[in-house]
Amino acid sequence: LSLHDALPISYLVKSDPSLPSVLQNLWDHTLRHANLMIVICGSAMSFIEKELLGEKSPLYGRATGILKMLPMPYWDAAQFFPNYSSEDKALAYAILGGIPRYLEEFDPDETIDANVKRHILRRIAPLYSEVEFLLHEELRETAKYNSVIRAIALGATSLNEIATHTMMANATVSSYLANLMELGIVEREFPVTAKPKERAKGSRGLYQLSDNFFRFWYSFVFPYRSELERGDVEGVYERHIKPVLHDFAGKPFEGLCREWMWRESAAGRLPFRARAVGRWWDRQDEIDVMAVDNASDAAIVGECKFRNAPVDRSVLNLLRDRAARTGIGQRTYLLFSLGGFDQSLVDDAAASQSDVQLVGIDELFHE
C-alpha cells in the first residue's frame, strides 16, 4: 500500500507537467503487475478529478476505484464531544458540520463559547483561514465566489435572488453555482415530492450551502473580518454571534432531524421504509422534514424547533394544516424539540392510535 497526499502531488505536477505521463508509463509497464495499491487522497478535489484522473490526463481510466468521502453523520460527529450536553453537541454540529478535520479543532473540555472564540475567531486559529485556503486551492476569482456564497449564507436561495444580491448577471451566477456544486460547497434542493421531470427542469430548486462550517464562516467571520483582524474576538462573539447562535442553528438542526429519520427508517423504526427524506414547500407553506413512501400514499411530516421553550399544540395544528396541502392522504406527524413539549402534546402522543410522535433532543443523540 502506497498512500499519497494529493496536495504535494499537485505542486509537483505544476512544476513538472510531464509527471502524469511518467506515472502512466510506470503504471502500465511495471506497477500494475505488482502487488501494490496506490492511494491518492486529499481535499484538492478539482486537481484529483480533472488534472490527475480527467479525460485529458495520461492517467485517465487507470483508477480502479474512486471514493468521495462524505461528512460524518451527526451521531458520529457527537463522539468528538463525549462530555457535551445534547444541546451543545447539536450546536457544535451546526457550527462545524461533519468534517473530522474541523471537529478535532474544538477542545471537548472547553465550552462552545470558548471554542468558537479560540479556534475560529482568532487570527492564528487554523479554522479562521480554512475557508479562504480551500477556495484559493480550488477556484479563481475568489472575490466573486465569496459574494455568491455569502448571498446564500444570508438566505438568498433562488438564482434571481443570488444574482440580485451579488449584482451579477444570472448567467454568470449560474456558472459560479455550477462550480460550487461540483466542489460540494453548494447543493440544489428540491421538494421531497418533486418528480424527476421537475428536478430536470430545475424551476423549483433552491440553492443552499451543503457545509455547515462554510455557512457559519460566511455568516459570522467573513462580515466581521475587520474587527477580528484588530483582535476584537470577544466583541464580535458577544455582539454578533452569541445572541443569534440558536437561531443560526435552527437550519442545521433541521438537517440533523432529517439524518435521524434516515437512520430510523434504515433500522425499521418508522411506519414505513422511506424512499426519500427532505423538505417540502410550495408557494405558501413549508415543511421542515418529510419522508415519503415508495409503495403507498403515505408520508411522515415533521416540524423542528431548536429553542429553549416547550413546543405546544399550536405547532402541531399548524403542521397538520400545512401537511394537508401536500396531497398525501396517510400522514404521521413528528415534532422535534430542544425545549421539550407541553403536557397536552405529551398526552396526545401517548394516546392509543396516536398519529403523533415527539422526539426530544436527548433522543436524537441516543444510540
Located regions from the model:
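A cross-kingdom feature that marks ATP-driven nucleic-acid transaction machinery
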Residues: 205-367
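Phosphate-binding site recognition
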Residues: 1-234
